[in-house]
Amino acid sequence: MEKGRTKVLIVLLIIVIIAAGGTLAYKLVKDKNKTQEVTGEENETPIITKEEKKIKIFSGNDRPIAVMIDNHSDAWPQAGLQDAYMVYEIIVEGGETRLMALFKGADVDKIGPVRSARHYFIDYAMENDAIYTHFGQSPQAASDIKKYNINDINGIAEDGTTFWRVKDKAAPHNAVTSTKKLLESAQSKKYKTTSTKESVLRYTTDEVNLENGQGAVSVTIPHSNLQTVKYVYNEESKVYERYARKKEQKDWTTGKTVTTKNIIITFCDNYTLTDSENKGRQGLKNIGTFDGYYITNGKAIKIKCIKNSREEKTIYQDLD
């Protein structure tokens, strides 16, 4: 690791998770009898990051496309997460979480189910210079899309064209899309489809050995009383397998377990917004410097995560 800044070396899918509500217990399990636990204050939230092995997708200058993915249990299984190079998971209202998957240079026939925008996800779309895809939006997200002049693709206006409905899931958990459809929509709107912006993280196929890291063969993140996510390290395949609500998460298209190579957790506060609709929508205090963890190959190290503005990319610093 480079001093002052982590070389976040991505080989598999990146997931960024923000857990909400209650006391957050983040566990690094060495073995069945030894557990190290880091406990946050109430409403302290982690962001987790994972990555994908298709390094060829970073050889070009294709602009990323971000897609909001439904994570309600009625939406399971989801499609496209394993094809994304980065996925953010953040708390939303009702104790649920939502995912934002990023695609670059990928050809994915089915992505979804697609759900509505939340304003703090826009921060991470901006730092990745991504076209932002959603199906509807909260009032705060609608305001920010206009305020920041976000290049977005909204399923409300493109249902039946860019998006289609599947019969094996009930609305609102049944809208899907594809990278081909999204690119066609972006081109029709005359959005730029290339980008020269530097990636948020550095990518390599080399293995990362966290020699001085603490054991992390099992990582548990209770976002709320409703949603607990767990990653279990498979020593044979050298990836983390994803579980949610004690269920192994499967890919909708392949039926295989959803996996990741690298995880980044950032701890920051979330809170309930006060608005006229009173739906319990969340806000996120994600601007500043926060504690975090980088996790890969069954080990974890502490890091600092710095985000100076909503538009600027997050910087991850090694503590060494």
Predicted stretch roles:
Residues 18-19, 24, 185:
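Residue-level detector of intrinsically disordered, flexible termini
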Residues 22-37:
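Hydrophobic single-pass membrane-insertion segments
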Residues 2-17, 27-29:
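N-terminal Sec-pathway targeting helices
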Residues 5-7, 36-84, 93-320:
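A surface/extracellular/periplasmic glyco- and lipid-processing/surface-interacting theme
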